[in-house]
Amino acid sequence: MSVTSIMDDLKRRMDGAISAFKHELSGLRTGRASASLLEPLTVEAYGSVVPIKQVANISVLEPRMLSVSVWDKTMVGAVERAIRDCGFGLNPIVDGMNLRIPLPELNEERRKELVKIAHQYAEQARVAIRHVRRDGMDNLKKLEKEGEISQDEARSLSEKVQKLTDDAIADIDKILIMKETEIMQV
């Protein structure tokens, strides 16, 4: 394994951890309507369970109102049930093949709960990044032991790995602060 491939792999895996963190955060409900809120939902359709995006189009009508346009009239009931049962306390209003979903205000207690969950997601992402860092350091030590790189090169590369790690964790912290601000905004 070459030094370049090790560094590229580290960067790719750290970026993957950040992307996964962003994806987890997108599922957290804030006070503002977002189509990504309903994306994780699944609907029982045509004898199997499919993502809601495969049977309907989700859009934002107003800051506190989502619209779900179901493509097949027979699926309206199943989509409505999935939204009602998702655990977000949403009550869709059926209007033909469209569902309007007003988002209720979040109370202070629920906002703090969501911030706590966001912090847990952030910590999981930081741990994932530290695991990637450890793997990179282990690979560098192995290359040094095998004589493919000198001790000085290993030290220099270790510092680069540490910088990559610090940058990735700083990105996570920045994303977390933005999400926290969004959640706590009344």
Curated annotation (Swiss-Prot):
<dbReference type="InterPro" id="IPR023584">
    <property type="entry name" value="Ribosome_recyc_fac_dom"/>
</dbReference>
<keyword id="KW-0963">Cytoplasm</keyword>
<dbReference type="GO" id="GO:0002184">
    <property type="term" value="P:cytoplasmic translational termination"/>
</dbReference>
<protein>
    <recommendedName>
        <fullName>Ribosome-recycling factor</fullName>
    </recommendedName>
</protein>
<comment type="function">
    <text>Responsible for the release of ribosomes from messenger RNA at the termination of protein biosynthesis. May increase the efficiency of translation by recycling ribosomes from one round of translation to another.</text>
</comment>
<dbReference type="InterPro" id="IPR002661">
    <property type="entry name" value="Ribosome_recyc_fac"/>
</dbReference>
<comment type="similarity">
    <text>Belongs to the RRF family.</text>
</comment>
<dbReference type="GO" id="GO:0043023">
    <property type="term" value="F:ribosomal large subunit binding"/>
</dbReference>
<keyword id="KW-0648">Protein biosynthesis</keyword>
<dbReference type="Pfam" id="PF01765">
    <property type="entry name" value="RRF"/>
</dbReference>
<dbReference type="GO" id="GO:0005829">
    <property type="term" value="C:cytosol"/>
</dbReference>
<dbReference type="InterPro" id="IPR036191">
    <property type="entry name" value="RRF_sf"/>
</dbReference>
